[in-house]
Amino acid sequence: MAFVEKKLPADAPIAQKALGWVDSRFPLTKLWEDQWGKYYAPKNFNFFYLFGSLAALVLVIQIVTGIFLVMNYKPDAQLAFASVEYIMREVPWGWLVRYMHSTGASAFFIVVYLHMTRALLYGSYRKPRELIWLFGVAIFLCLMGEAFFGYLLPWGQMSYWGAQVIVNLFGAIPFIGPDLSLWIRGDYVVSDATLNRFFAFHVIAIPLVLLGLVVAHLIALHEVGSNNPDGIEVKDNLGPDGHGVDTIPSHPYYTTKDIFGVSVFLTIFSAVVFFAPEFGGYFLEYNNFIPADPLKTPSHIAPVWYFTPFYSILRAVTSQFMSALVLCTIAYAALIVFRTRLPQMIKNGVVGVAVVMVIGMLVFDAKFWGVVLMGVSVLILAGMPWLDHSPVKSIRYRPEWHKIVYAVFGTTFLVLGYLGVQAPTAIRTLVAQIGTLIYFGFFMLMPWWSAMGEFKPVPKRVTFQPH
């Protein structure tokens, strides 16, 4: 195809001529219009639809501040802690960059958790958005990996011993565990070798994967279109222009909304950075202001707050709790066999898996199954599109008691998070065990409870009140 220069009037502004020159060689304007400027989205977005753009903003903050931190950080066990102190005390505005990065880590998980909450409430994981959800879960897993690898870098007491505890968990895997832990650490204990490989993963490997997944997430979103609080497919009602009658272009409408949301977010973010960067020891643990000492274990080791719900599930699995897990496994297999219409071959497979699991629970210790449940508690999110059998997507049109189920699940998640930062006691362990059963019960029983009850009629068009 012959090259065609974009024609513009001779008196066109210089900026317009420059843009035309670029558009003739690179589809800049087309990309802008396809991805945002003329991307039509449902007109009834609410507060929950701010957090996707906020997550993108925080990702940019983390990348930019991370670049400046790496300029002065030394990934050496003898120099790492001192280099962080050097950044805080000697590098111009280094304290601000460090606090923005540490606050940004927690802010990232806050907006991502709220982003996922919106998806759960409005059924944004349902057909045809399964792939969007799967990319999102993969992004969440990458965020957890990125946070874990970065947690060791300050080389403080809590980061050192936290990494030691988490890596040692892999040692609970039968047969290959000890060798796997040694391979991950690169040494018999967390050392300079561990710090260097964690630094490489945190700075290069995981961010590259994360950026690729974010791009895939957005491409999948723009292919099938955005969901909305009513869970209605707006593409089913098209106007003469070929766009949904209940949609509006993202620019300028949602650009304005997002700018306002960003301004509020940055106000809160700045308040934390300038006035409470440690946030009571939750964003920056006080023990991490002490250099790592391999010979002195802290009295209580806990991960950062955004990992604590899953850490609580890990700690909840004790030898006494194994009997409850055995009973739950048998009961769930019986439920599938007697209360579903699945093919007999699948039922036989479920029984076989249940038998293997029960034998494994009797053979392997509780520590191994704690690690398994902690991993499954995250990975089970990927099954949401196929676990939810509700005839409607949005919580708005589900039975009222469904809202109670979601509220109990959310409260349980918060309670598990609180217990994860506390020292274990008999009562706290019992509460965590109950919370673990509720957490998994929410997902594993979803194929049944999500289809039960009296559902409200779903309107043909989105509900929208101008304001």
Model segments located where?
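Membrane-embedded and interfacial regions of multi-pass energy-transducing membrane proteins
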Residues: 2-107, 111-467
